């Protein structure tokens, strides 16, 4: 791993602390800048993961850490909450190494050594979703699950082991065709390989952020509960649970009919894969506009 040196900033908020870490480029990196902010609930003894919201192009998601709804969500799972200000989404620039270096610094600042090893859940909108998908492909063993919302430039090459990382992929019915085609194509290319992914088209919308938090949060909670081992040593690399195909439910992209592994009679290779019946029902309601 490339040697990177952090720049640190400290904030204090009542029952929690917030820290900023920036990782400047070294002479082998070309990602421009990488700035991170993290919140940890003081009542959390041992962290189990990091919920990371990623911004759209030229954005900055660091202020997400002061959002009380997200704080409550992640605290229930004993996760940290993180936002970032990042320029480059391509892992060959060294940006992935910068993320890992930032976690090492946060581990020291928060006095939570487990931050060196716990997995990420990445939820990204537009460019941020593309980043999250690329990060998942780069280091799938450190990602418990991901959400990508309506990006149009996801890497279309083989996803490798990332097919075992549960993903929720959103497209907008009225978005630009290239965005719909990019993510739909990746989904259809990898579902026959067993990718544990969901494709959800939001009807009547364009390039807007998804606000169905019941669906988003249900996916996060379900995946976290299933993928994180009941007993785990968070002070060394964590072996995340691989979810068997038989656990899943499936959903037809056209009829919106869902069914369990044993009962579903649709075309598996082009159907969404859900980690639970509840997530499948949330998808069904979302894509059908509640019909």
Describe the function of each predicted region.
Residues 193, 203-291:
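Alpha/beta-hydrolase-fold serine-hydrolase catalytic core, especially in secreted/extracellular enzymes
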Residues 3-14:
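Sec-dependent N-terminal signal peptides
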Residues 44-91, 176-180:
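Short substrate-entry loop that stabilizes the transition state in hydrolases
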Residues 16-50, 120-138, 153, 289-291:
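A domain-start/cap signature at the N-terminus of enzymes
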Residues 45-51, 76-82, 116-119, 139-145, ...:
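Loop/turn elements at helix/coil->beta-strand transitions in domains of secreted/extracellular proteins
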Residues 52-58, 125, 132, 136, ...:
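Cell-envelope and extracellular/periplasmic
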Residues 90-115, 134:
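Alpha/beta-hydrolase active-site loop
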Residues 144-221:
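The feature captures the conserved acid-bearing segment of alpha/beta-hydrolase catalytic domains
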């Amino acid at each position: 791993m490339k040697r990177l040196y952090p720049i640190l900033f400290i904030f204090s908020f009542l029952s929690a602390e917030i820290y900023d870490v920036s990782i400047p480029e070294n002479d082998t990196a070309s990602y421009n800048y990488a700035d991170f902010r993290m919140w940890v609930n003081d009542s959390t003894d041992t962290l189990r993961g990091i919920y990371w919201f990623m911004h759209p192009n030229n954005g900055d998601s660091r202020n997400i850490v002061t959002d009380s709804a997200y704080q409550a969500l992640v605290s229930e799972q004993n996760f940290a909450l993180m936002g970032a200000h990042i320029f480059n989404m391509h892992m060959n620039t060294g940006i992935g190494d910068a993320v890992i270096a930032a976690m090492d610094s946060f581990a020291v600042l928060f006095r939570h050594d487990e931050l060196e090893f716990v997995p990420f859940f990445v939820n990204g909108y537009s460019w941020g979703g593309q980043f999250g998908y690329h990060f998942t492909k780069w280091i799938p063993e450190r990602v418990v699950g991901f959400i990508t919302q309506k990006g149009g430039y996801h890497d279309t090459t083989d996803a490798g082991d990332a097919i075992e990382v549960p993903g929720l992929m959103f497209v907008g019915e009225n978005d630009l065709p290239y965005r719909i085609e990019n993510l739909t194509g990746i989904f259809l290319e990898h579902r026959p390989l067993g990718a544990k992914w969901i494709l959800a088209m939001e009807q009547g919308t364009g390039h807007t952020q998804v606000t169905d938090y019941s669906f988003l949060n249900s996916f996060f909670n379900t995946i976290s509960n299933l993928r994180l081992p009941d007993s785990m040593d968070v002070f060394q690399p964590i072996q995340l649970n691989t979810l068997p195909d038989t656990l899943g439910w499936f959903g037809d992209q056209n009829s919106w009919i869902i069914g369990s592994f044993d009962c579903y009679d649709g075309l598996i290779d082009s159907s969404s894969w859900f980690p639970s019946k509840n997530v499948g029902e949330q998808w069904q309601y979302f894509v059908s506009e509640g019909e």
